[in-house]
């Protein structure tokens, strides 16, 4: 690192990981990074711990270690989204993904708290803006985007795109520079 320093540190954050001294701890299927189930945290339907405060902790920890500006390049919630009819939505359909809005709101509030801790956060990008096929599972059942793509894992579907409720929510967060976040 001495000869090839970096200008900033970028990282992805989806969940925290807990450890235990118990020789036979409960391990959840969502703990892809190892670790054990944290009974204090909610988990997504994929078993990933939902830990917004863990993001603030990670930001503080990385700053303390490297003293480089930080860039969150991936953060989001994968879920099985249900497309529903909604006459008020463009194209007459949407996904009411309050769970994604809550996840992102709570994580962005913690980014704001880290900034108040004087952590230099360069930026934040969500994962992802549009539903896509998973590189690890080659399926689209688990969706992250603000835009729903009518595509199934077997390849069927019209490929029509629909804005989810989170699309307009995130658009408003950007337009208000975070003032619309619920604290």
Question: Predicted regions: what is each one?
Answer:
Residues 1-183:
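Non-catalytic scaffold segments within catalytic domains of secreted glycoside hydrolases
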């Amino acid at each position: 690192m001495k000869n090839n320093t970096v200008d900033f540190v970028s990282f992805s954050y989806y969940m925290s990981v807990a450890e235990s001294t118990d020789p036979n701890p409960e391990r959840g299927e969502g703990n892809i990074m190892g670790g054990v189930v944290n009974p204090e945290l909610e988990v997504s339907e994929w078993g990933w711990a939902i830990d917004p405060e863990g993001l603030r902790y990670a930001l503080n920890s990385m700053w303390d270690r490297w003293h480089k500006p930080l860039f969150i390049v991936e953060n989001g919630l994968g879920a099985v989204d249900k497309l529903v009819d909604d006459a008020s939505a463009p194209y007459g359909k949407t996904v009411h993904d309050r769970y994604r809005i809550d996840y992102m709101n709570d994580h962005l509030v913690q980014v704001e708290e880290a900034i108040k801790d004087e952590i230099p956060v360069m930026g934040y990008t969500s994962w992802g803006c549009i539903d896509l096929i998973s590189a690890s599972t080659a399926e689209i059942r688990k969706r992250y985007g603000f835009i729903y793509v009518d595509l199934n894992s077997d390849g069927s579907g019209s490929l029509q795109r629909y804005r989810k409720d989170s699309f307009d929510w995130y658009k408003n967060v950007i337009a208000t520079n975070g003032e619309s976040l619920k604290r």
